Amino acid sequence: MKSNAILAVVVLLVALSPLLLPTYQVTLLNYIGMNALVVLGLVLLTGVGGMTSFGQAALVGIGAYTTAYLSVTEQLPTFLAWTGGGPWVGLFLGLIITIFSALLVGGLTLKLSGHYLPLGTIAWGISLYYFFSTIPTLGGHSGIANIPSIEIAGYALDTNNKMFYLIWLILLIAMILTRNLLNSREGRAIRALKGGQIMAESMGVNTFRSKMIVFVTSSVFASIAGWLYAHNQSFINPTPFGLQMGIDYLFMALLGGVGSIWGAVVGAGIFTMMRQWLQDVLPMIFGGEGNYETIVFGLMIVVLMQKSPAGLWSLLLKLLPTRYQLKGSHLSLTPTSHTLAKPTLPAHGTEILQALDVTKAFGGLIANNQMNLNIRAGEILALIGPNGAGKSTMFNQLSGVDTPTSGDVIFLGQRINGIPSREIAKLGLSRTFQHVKILPEMTVLENVVIGAHLRGQRGVFASMFRLDREEENILLNEAKQQLERVGLGEYLYTEAGALALGQQRILEIARALCAHPCLLLLDEPAAGLRLKEKQALAELLIKLKSEGMAILLVEHDMDFVMNLVDRVVVMEFGQKIAEGLPYDIQNDQAVLEAYLGGAA
């Protein structure tokens, strides 16, 4: 509600601006709106998705040059002549070309990671810039002039005041669609890209698909901004679509807050106004022409990254009275009688998983050496061993995070070696992690509902236009039910990063249960828990076992393990040294020497 109130106030102020401000300032607001649209795409791509791009300006150029060419050229090529040209055809074809380009470029560059990804965006950004500069049909360095204004039902938007409303209406729609997307099943998958990709894949999220969604969406925003720019200016040349402008867009995102929708508007506004002012003032101070504003912006970004890495929007929020401050995401959650379909679990005693001579080598280090184990439905199996024995490595191979160097992993009768973890999750395996993998800035409820990702069906467009509300409510209620089941029902809207470590481990269990798996892998679930919490966890696992779920756990608390599990497998130096009932393991001489410190 508070976000909607801020939106209403901003919309009112923006709507009145052309009536109250001189033409020059309205023109400046038009540039702010167009820049903010590009930066909004960077909020999705860089701030939320964690993918840095220096090439957004080139995507703006695709939209601008497409509409300019179609609007100005009198004799269009045969394959385009049937369209008749014009601004609206330019918008349509510009979006098609942009989406095709984004799919092509994204398919090549989004597989890169680390510093290679931004270097890749620089490469294709420069390539597109020189394409615009050297193609004679596009005017070369001289550009394209006499671009006609946009017409709506015969009404020409031939002044800055008239263009103002179209620019800001499109920006407003883009902001609403972005907000809707981020507060959805697809949006949570996107938000997991930054720091949670292994977890997301293990929950069934196709992270490459999510990256492509973000990249294409941000490219579409940039292309529309280019379309607006061309018809607002009536003239374009390659200069605004080069690497320098790509860097400027990133700076705007950082300035306002790269992870905030409102930060896109704030960053674009402050940068655009400051640049204009500095370009007028600094030459008078220093004498002569020069890009002095670049020095100021460089100093600003250094100070900002030290004092407010979240950008100026977060600082502005802190200045508001407490009652008006936005308190994170509060998802709409209403009781419902509808529930998610639950796949039938295999019958008790059915063999769920087998590991056959599984070996994992990292160079010359053998982490797992011909490991064998199996687990059946309705059974709790413990995998124990000293630190460094290779237990978590084994977990990663069973769940698809790693691929065995040799040997086979059989899950429900299917060999799963080399299958991505998201595909194994579809078969009915869910897991937690030795080192907790949560999204700390998201609420507990949002973190847990990621586990139900595979149980939802609605996609990007349904999310943007809020056609997914019924399914979304069912998913959220499933997450709420699992949180109540594990004892975290009172923390639904608490930021996950604010929970104690033990509670975060319980959160991971709730998230895994949201997938309704037939096999649950728990990596040190009792670490950090107090006695009563361990007792509650044991009761939960026993109940899950009685329902037919197979549970494989790694744990160092021997009292917890020996009083809970049906069988135990013991590892040392990557090998299995013992397997049997808890009583037998407790009295096994090899285990006592290797793991429990020798015979008493």
Where are these regions (language model features)?
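Transmembrane alpha-helices and adjacent helix-loop boundaries
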Residues: 1-336
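The feature captures the beta-strand-to-loop junction immediately N-terminal to the Walker
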Residues: 384-386
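Helix-to-loop junction immediately C-terminal to a conserved catalytic motif
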Residues: 399
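Conserved ABC transporter NBD signature motif
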Residues: 407-415, 427
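Conserved ABC ATPase "signature" region
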Residues: 459-491, 539-542
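Catalytic Walker B motif of ABC-type/P-loop ATPase nucleotide-binding domains
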Residues: 520-524
